[in-house]
Amino acid sequence: MIKKSAAILAGGKSSRMNYINKAFLKYEENYFIERIIKALEDYEEIIIISNNPEEYTEFGLKVFKDIYPSQGPLSGIHSALNYIKNDYCLVVACDMPFINKEVVNYLGNIKEDYEILIPKFQERLQPLCAIYKKSCKDIMEKELINNSNKLIKTCFKFSMKVVEEFPFIEKIHKKEIKNFYNINTVHEYEDLIRKKEI
């Protein structure tokens, strides 16, 4: 058991997905959110951040609303850090159907000498599959109050440890290397399903 919390961010408007709740898109017979919950099962606590908590009752998890709604993923992370019981929280977006258990467990077991532990994959930082220290919430709140809600910009206000190497990555099946791949548009989702059926 990893003595950290995990939070699934499911509060976005999904405007590029015709306002469909991306958490309930299906891949291989399971909702995205079901696949993510399964990958996070070794974390001591799992919560969901959503402004529609009634949609998630079937999963038996605590669901909390954004403290500062309609301010993007920074608001979701800030809310999660206010509600978790542990000092560190892995944050995952609900539109990442390939979240891999081995990857998130590897992150969760890295020594806690950071405020933010953030993977870098294919030359890009991945703030929506990263671990945040609970104490980050205070500076995040100041940013939200000032309407400065840019996530990456805010991350640079903290001591970050960047993870660029995953020693086991070559052992992971090709489709699971997409751990950080997210679905933003109807076209991307249709393309995902089409490739699965080929």
Swiss-Prot record:
Belongs to the MobA family. GO terms for cellular component: cytoplasm. The keyword Transferase applies. GTP binds at L9, A10, G11, K22, D66, D95. This is Probable molybdenum cofactor guanylyltransferase. Mg(2+) binds at D95. GO terms for biological process: Mo-molybdopterin cofactor biosynthetic process. GO terms for molecular function: GTP binding; metal ion binding; molybdenum cofactor guanylyltransferase activity. The lineage of its organism: Bacteria, Bacillati, Bacillota, Clostridia, Eubacteriales. It comes from Clostridium perfringens (strain SM101 / Type A). Coiled coil: none annotated. Its cofactor is Mg(2+). It comes from the Bacteria.
